[in-house]
Swiss-Prot record:
Biological classification of the source: Bacteria, Pseudomonadati, Pseudomonadota, Gammaproteobacteria, Vibrionales
Native source species: Vibrio splendidus (strain 12B01)
Chief site of localization: secreted
Residues the record lists as binding NAD(+): 68-80, 117-120, 137, 191
Role noted for this protein: A probable mono(ADP-ribosyl)transferase, it may ADP-ribosylate Arg in target protein(s). Upon expression in yeast cells causes cell death.
Name the UniProt record assigns to this protein: Putative NAD(+)--arginine ADP-ribosyltransferase Vis
GO molecular function, one term: nucleotide binding
EC number(s) on file: 2.4.2.31
GO terms for cellular component: extracellular region
SUPFAM superfamilies named among the record's database cross-references: ADP-ribosylation
Family: Belongs to the Arg-specific ADP-ribosyltransferase family.
Domain of life: Bacteria
Length: 249
């Protein structure tokens, strides 16, 4: 079997037989190994393009490429905004861009397996989270199949007046994840992207003084009933009427 393919299998099944959070707690592998694994994931992504990919447009490809560079900032700012009425023309442009990226995702390979995300979360939200709660991200959610990449995104504390804490997510992806590694300008990130409004059910939480480790699994919105649900960005409890107002149309 090809050595590079073996490395890719190792990457994709890093935590198959390990305890929760083992992979993300391990010392980082060498930069050379991480780069090679990312390259292998990029190759796998390209090889996994199905019939839907034949319908992807040049505009959609460009939108995904731009998303990984800077487009994510405008798109996610708009999706997370509580009031978009002041955006004017920029709001219309943002909505069109979001629709284009979402359309592209539906034509890119699906990924099922484990991925990771490093970020900062409001301490007020973390303090009330319990196993079984559902986190809803109104914006696009970026993850990586490489824990080393995920950890890089939680190194620098954001400039925010809110009290934040570093969080490392281990994500069991059952549905909703699409690899953009074959198109992304930052293909070394082995990125798996979720469209807005992704739902993640908490399966495990481990709190330490420096980090909070959270294990989640993807769930369909329709499957979430009688469960505490929080907006991952704002920390607010999500009500049904409020949630529908977040959907980008």
């Amino acid at each position: 079997m090809n050595t590079r393919f073996l490395l890719l299998l190792c990457c994709l099944s890093f935590t198959t037989f390990s305890q929760p959070f083992d992979a993300i707690k391990q010392p980082n592998r060498s930069e050379e190994e991480v780069t090679q694994l990312a390259e292998d994931f990029k190759d796998w992504s390209k090889a996994s393009n199905g019939w839907r990919y034949s319908f992807i447009t040049a505009n959609e490809k460009e939108a995904v490429e731009d998303f990984s560079i800077s487009g994510y900032q405008t798109a996610n700012d708009y999706l997370r905004a509580t009031d978009t009425s002041t955006w004017g023309v920029a709001g219309a442009d943002a909505r069109q861009y979001i629709r284009t990226v979402k359309s592209a995702l539906n034509k890119l390979p699906k990924y099922k397996g484990t991925a990771y995300r490093g970020t900062w979360v409001k301490l007020s939200l973390l303090n009330k989270l319990e196993e079984g709660d559902v986190l809803v991200e109104p914006a696009f959610t970026s993850t990586s199949t490489l824990p080393e990449v995920a950890k890089r995104f939680s190194v620098v504390h954001p400039n925010s007046p809110q009290r934040l804490k570093r969080v490392l997510f281990e994500v069991k992806i059952n549905q909703g994840g699409h690899t953009i590694a074959g198109l992304s300008e930052y293909s070394k990130e082995a990125e798996v992207l979720f469209a807005p409004n992704a739902h993640f059910r908490i399966t495990q939480i481990e709190r330490t003084s420096n980090h909070t480790y959270i294990g989640v699994e993807t769930v369909k919105a329709s499957a979430v009933k009688n469960t505490q649900k929080y907006n991952l960005y704002s920390g607010e409890e999500v009500e049904a009427s409020f949630w529908h107002s977040l959907v980008c149309t």
